[in-house]
Amino acid sequence: MKILGVIVTPNLKWDANTDFICKKAYSKMWALRRMKVLGLDSFTLLDFYLKEVRVHLELAVPVWHSGLTVKLSADIERVQKVAISIILGQYDINYVQACTQIGLKPLFIRRQELCERFVLKTSSPTSKHSDMFQLEKNGTHSTRSKNQYREHVCLKNRFYKSPLPYLTRVLNQL
């Protein structure tokens, strides 16, 4: 089932969604290759990548980031690796060095930052969805627990990796 551009399967695995966003991003890569052949500068190519390709890889990240496997994360990173190699014109370059050279962060770091920004905006008192995260009730005693928000009891690993418990853990770590 596709909801707002995110493919949600009944078993809450994100293989289909990852395949979908990677295919969508790869379909935009032909334009990046064509622009490189036409001789556009690296700044323009990078700008195109950021505005036309990477947006597909970051759509609704807080929903599916916590459920990614290592393989799915590597599939998404591969898209950026290909884009960087096209922009730089070097196909045998180290990915992390190329990211720093071009001024980008690896996508797994970027996804984490997007989740942190989302959770901070959502938990602010002015947000319409601030009740999504419940404050911990400590009563009258002061405790050493740093958790300000109540974490969900997760009996199964699938629920532990779902968005709400993950985002609550992120919020408590900030």
PLM features: residue spans?
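Hydrophobic/basic alpha-helical segments
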Residues: M1-L174
